[in-house]
UniProtKB/Swiss-Prot annotation:
EC number assigned by the record: 4.2.3.4
UniProt keyword annotation of Lyase present: yes
Reaction catalysis annotation: 7-phospho-2-dehydro-3-deoxy-D-arabino-heptonate = 3-dehydroquinate + phosphate
Residues that, per the record, bind NAD(+): T134, T135, K147, K156, T174, L175, I176, T177
Predominant localisation class: cytoplasm
Gene: aroB
Species whose genome carries this gene: Prochlorococcus marinus subsp. pastoris (strain CCMP1986 / NIES-2087 / MED4)
Protein name: 3-dehydroquinate synthase
Keyword Amino-acid biosynthesis tagged: yes
């Protein structure tokens, strides 16, 4: 099977994203190829479910290539993306004796990847880590770009660091075991790339035959949307690694989405489901401000719904919405900034949105 290779070009610490069917069986060989010697200790961080599915396979391959590796599982779910899980990883790192020459591997979805990345950024002031994402959302979004974090009771991803992985290894075969709801949630991030930067991807996703292939996990279609999504993200991240400018457009739908995740209770809505509703709200505001046409807004809404994702805003107290938004990482000098579409495949950053223009979408 052909191996897709995407470079994330940065001023320091550029790295590869490798996409290949069956790659989970060859991670040891890939580590050696990128210069990681087998004398380095490895701690694989996963959760019980993912570890049961893929952990033993990965561990056996690493040991076949003479790596000294062990697996440690954290609890699954957004509610465990916290300091407790981070501390558990630190305890495991201490027990197995990870030093500055050691390696962490994140095997799992976005939560495992974010927490493991933050552990790598802070253990002994920084050790290398590898991302092996096993969900669509983590493949196309969170595993690439170096954002690592844990949640705080006051908000999502408030404590973290920009810390790039040594490499990202993606095996689309791992999606076969992914629950349908989680796969569809991952499609929200793919749709996002179509709206913010890649009109051709948006149109590809609109095609009914393509949609059926994607939802039926047809390999060629999966690799195509993963490839296009990561290329878009790599292009943006290479231009603005630490989100001082254009990288903020990757947060399209996320300000409102994070409000929904937080106020409805983490886990009530999956991240991608909340982002879908956030994109719907952003699209409606853009239409109201004559930034893009009603037709484009309706096309976006239809595309979101066609992949089984929600667009209906849940009932939330308006006062609570403002508290969460003012704690958003995109706030600058006390002003909220919103990513709004101005065309299919193009968005911009606005800080002149009145409260009344978005609070009305929350009951």
């Amino acid at each position: 099977m052909h191996k897709n290779k995407i470079l994330v070009p940065l001023s320091n610490n550029s790295y590869e994203v490798i996409i290949k069917q069956g790659l989970i069986n060859n991670i040891g060989e890939e580590l050696i190829r990128i210069g990681i010697n087998s004398n380095r200790k490895i701690l694989i961080v996963s959760n019980k479910e993912i570890s049961t599915l893929f952990g033993r396979k990965l561990l056996n391959n690493l040991k076949k290539n003479n790596f000294n590796a062990e697996i440690f599982n954290i609890k699954a779910g957004e509610s465990h993306k916290n300091f407790a899980s981070l501390s558990e990883i630190f305890n495991a790192a201490f027990e197995v004796g990870l030093d500055r020459n050691s390696l962490l591997i994140a095997l799992g979805g976005g939560i495992v990847g974010d927490v493991t990345g933050f552990a790598a950024a802070t253990w002994l002031r920084g050790i290398e880590y590898i991302q092996i994402p096993t969900t669509l959302l983590s493949m196309v979004d969170s595993s690439v770009g170096g954002k690592t974090a844990v949640n705080h009771p006051k908000g999502k991803n408030l404590i973290g660091a920009f810390y790039q992985p040594k490499a990202v290894f993606i095996d689309p075969e791992t999606l076969i075991t992914l629950p349908t709801r989680e796969f569809k949630a991952g499609m929200a991030e793919v749709i996002k790339y179509g709206v913010i930067k890649d009109k051709s991807l948006f149109e590809y996703l609109e095609n009914e035959k393509n949609r059926d292939k994607i939802l039926n996990l047809e390999n060629e279609s999966l690799i195509k949307i993963i490839n296009k999504s990561i290329k878009t993200k790599a292009c943006i991240v290479s231009e603005d690694e630490k989100e001082n400018g254009i990288r903020a457009i990757l947060n399209y739908g996320h300000s409102f989405g994070h409000v929904i995740e937080n106020l409805c209770g983490y886990g009530e809505y999956l991240h991608g489901e909340a982002i879908s509703i956030g994109m719907k709200i952003a699209g409606d505001i853009a239409t109201e401000k004559n930034l893009w046409s009603k037709e484009h807004s309706l096309r976006q809404d239809h595309l979101i719904e066609s992949y089984g994702l929600p667009i209906q805003t849940p009932k939330i107290k308006k006062n609570d919405v403002m508290k969460i938004l003012m704690g958003d990482k995109k706030v600058r000098n006390g002003k909220m900034r919103f990513i709004l579409p101005i065309e299919l495949g193009e968005v911009d950053i606005f800080n002149d949105i009145n409260e009344s223009q978005f609070l009305k979408y929350f009951n």
